[in-house]
């Protein structure tokens, strides 16, 4: 063998040896994946279900006339706060956890999905007239039970408040209890307010809306019976959306009296406490439909009994939140516009057939639904104020108008390997959604 041939033989053997070594190294480096998702074979229970929501049972029942459906909101924290002016207002920094509408019997029963981190306190709020505005309860074993009815706070008879003698400033029709409930209510004049009346009032002067100008007026009502009969005048309490515990009263003056004479007229208290919402422990002494019969007070401030002569006008006033402030208030609202310090008209009035509605705007939001009353006379024709007529709500199930809207927004991320094991990056498909759900007036029972 020549030297050249020997070189090539050695070179070839070395080449094959090197290749063999490389193959062995590559094979020995191909070990299996040592990741063990079970943590080394130990069985550890995984109690985290990745859920951010929970399912609860919601049972709500309002004491309402048949056919009156109530739109309500459920919060897990107090939805009210006090603004710079000292008024209790609905918060704007939170949204309801649940918004629903009852059926025609005032009931709602359904499963609801809420955030898993909800607390135990529950606040149920509605702006609908004729029912309590705010009720606080709790959630127990994932169930909310709320049987909502007019619950008057305890009161004991008294002639005057602890530190305020109203008789030094105002005329009195009688005494009242510590919760502001008059001891002179007229049971014969009490009325169960119908669903049609309540719905018509709600639709005419809506919470959070702007009261149409046509209803705003100086709502001083004139007694004028064409047959000259003895006339009695009464006021029924309807309700309202005010957070204030206001004093409501009236005054009498002759038709054509000057502003000076009207201002000097003796002011009489009718309802010492018009609060019905139950905010911040304020007392409740009235419920919708309860009535007081007025007395005619002559120009000298003398009580002449319950018969009103023709030609007398009756004006109204509201002392904002004065019942819980010993008669003091920073806002007095009169139905006689000329008496209002801000120059504004603070009353709205309209009729539903023969049912005359008087409503106050007690501050500045212009919805004019804060406190509402029904003024009526016997004979009924004796008070026929020139106020707009409103068509009563028909109260039929054909009304399919939108009661409320709920908007859902979010982002969904998908893993396309599920349920097989994979990379779990959850970025294979990403969807951003915006869904608007409309609820009509009939309550959705099956969802």
Whereabouts are the PLM-identified features?
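Short Pro-Gly-centered beta-turn/loop motif in secreted/extracellular proteins
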Residues: 103-121, 292-312
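Conserved small/polar residues in nucleotide/adenosyl-binding loops
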Residues: 439-446
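Sec-dependent bacterial lipoprotein signal peptides
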Residues: 2-28
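Short beta-strand-plus-loop segments that form exposed binding edges in beta-rich domains
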Residues: 361-364
């Amino acid at each position: 063998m020549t030297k050249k041939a020997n070189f090539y033989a050695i070179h070839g053997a070395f080449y094959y040896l090197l290749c063999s070594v490389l193959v062995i190294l590559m094979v020995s480096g191909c070990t299996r994946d040592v990741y063990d998702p079970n943590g080394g074979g130990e069985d550890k229970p995984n109690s985290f279900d990745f859920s951010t929501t929970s399912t609860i049972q919601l049972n709500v029942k309002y004491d309402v006339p048949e056919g009156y459906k109530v739109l309500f909101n459920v919060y897990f924290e107090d939805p009210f706060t006090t603004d710079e002016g000292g008024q209790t207002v609905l918060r704007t920094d939170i949204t309801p956890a649940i918004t629903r509408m009852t059926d025609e019997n005032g009931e709602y029963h359904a499963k609801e999905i809420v955030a898993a981190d909800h607390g135990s306190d529950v606040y149920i709020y509605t702006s609908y007239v004729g029912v309590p505005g705010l009720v606080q309860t709790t959630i127990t074993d994932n169930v909310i039970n709320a049987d909502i009815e007019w619950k008057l706070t305890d009161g004991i008879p008294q002639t005057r408040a602890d530190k305020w003698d109203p008789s030094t400033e105002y005329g009195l029709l009688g005494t009242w209890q510590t919760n502001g409930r008059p001891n002179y209510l007229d049971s014969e004049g009490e009325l169960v307010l119908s669903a049609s009346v309540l719905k018509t009032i709600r639709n005419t002067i809506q919470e959070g809306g702007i009261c149409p100008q046509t209803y705003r007026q100086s709502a001083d009502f004139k007694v004028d019976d064409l047959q000259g009969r003895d006339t009695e005048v009464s006021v029924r309490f309807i309700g309202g959306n005010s957070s204030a515990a206001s004093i409501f009263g009236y005054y009498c003056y002759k038709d054509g009296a000057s502003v000076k004479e009207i201002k000097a007229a003796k002011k009489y208290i009718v309802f010492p406490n018009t609060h019905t919402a139950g905010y911040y422990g304020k007392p409740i002494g009235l419920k919708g439909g309860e009535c007081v019969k007025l007395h005619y007070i002559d120009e000298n401030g003398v009580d002449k009994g319950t018969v009103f002569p023709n030609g007398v006008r009756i004006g109204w006033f509201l002392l904002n939140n004065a019942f819980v402030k010993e008669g003091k208030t920073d806002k007095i609202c009169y139905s006689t516009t000329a008496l209002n310090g801000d120059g504004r008209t603070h009353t709205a009035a309209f009729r539903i057939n023969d049912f005359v509605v008087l409503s106050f705007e007690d501050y500045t939001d212009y919805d004019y639904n804060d406190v509402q009353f029904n003024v009526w006379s016997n004979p009924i024709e004796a008070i026929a104020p020139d106020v707009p007529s409103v068509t009563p709500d028909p109260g039929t199930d054909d009304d399919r108008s939108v009661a409320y809207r709920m908007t859902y927004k979010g982002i969904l991320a998908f893993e396309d390997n599920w349920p097989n094991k994979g990379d779990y990056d959850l970025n294979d498909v990403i969807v951003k959604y915006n869904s608007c759900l409309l609820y009509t007036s009939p309550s959705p029972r099956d969802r």
